[in-house]
């Protein structure tokens, strides 16, 4: 499993309310993204926003971030996002009452 963090600076005309409304509008569309397990839409008072994504594979993540999604981010926010990838070693899910250990290396 891969976790990716994506961040971009919001332009001045996109405030908290506009960002929240946009995220609410686009969230259902991520149900169809191949290899995406989950996405958290995030916002900070510092004026940065983005997402924390859980992916099945690094290949799925890289394919998504290099496609039309990237063009949309650059067009909407006026900058290329910062994207970092992390290998997940273990996942504690308190909502489901589970702990999952990932023993096969993904990145290293």
Enumerate the language-model features and the residues they cover.
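Short S/T/G/P-rich N-terminal loop/turn motif that feeds into the first structured element of a domain
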Residues: 1-48, 58-66, 77-108
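Conserved RNP beta-strands of RNA recognition motif
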Residues: 51-55
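A common structural junction motif
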Residues: 71-75
């Amino acid at each position: 499993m891969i976790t990716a963090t994506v961040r971009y600076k919001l332009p001045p005309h996109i405030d908290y309310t506009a960002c929240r409304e946009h995220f609410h509008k686009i969230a259902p569309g991520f149900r169809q993204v191949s290899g995406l397990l989950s996405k958290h839409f995030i916002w900070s008072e510092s004026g940065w926003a983005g997402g924390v994504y859980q992916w099945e594979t690094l290949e799925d993540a890289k394919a998504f971030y290099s496609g039309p999604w990237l063009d949309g981010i650059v067009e909407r926010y006026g900058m290329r996002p910062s994207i970092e990838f992390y290998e997940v070693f273990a996942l504690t899910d308190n909502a489901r009452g589970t702990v999952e250990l990932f023993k096969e290396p993904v990145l290293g």
